[in-house]
């Protein structure tokens, strides 16, 4: 299991974990967010959320 907390400024660290499953950050209402492709579809990752990759390689987001 691997995890990384999104800080709003660590896109390269998130990209290293998620590869092409994550889209470039975007700015909305004063915050930076990401979109992450999971088995359930695209999920918005907000600053302070934690992205988790389980032992099967699947991603989910913890708030």
What name fits each language-model region?
Residues 1-39:
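N-terminal non-globular leader segments, chiefly Sec-dependent signal peptides
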Residues 40-63:
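Short, compact, well-ordered microdomains
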């Amino acid at each position: 299991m691997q995890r990384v907390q999104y800080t709003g400024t660590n896109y390269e660290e998130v990209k290293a974990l998620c590869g092409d499953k994550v889209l470039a950050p975007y700015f909305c209402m004063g915050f930076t967010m990401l979109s992450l492709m999971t088995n359930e579809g695209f999920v918005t990752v907000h600053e302070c959320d934690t992205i988790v990759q389980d032992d099967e390689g699947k991603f989910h987001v913890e708030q």
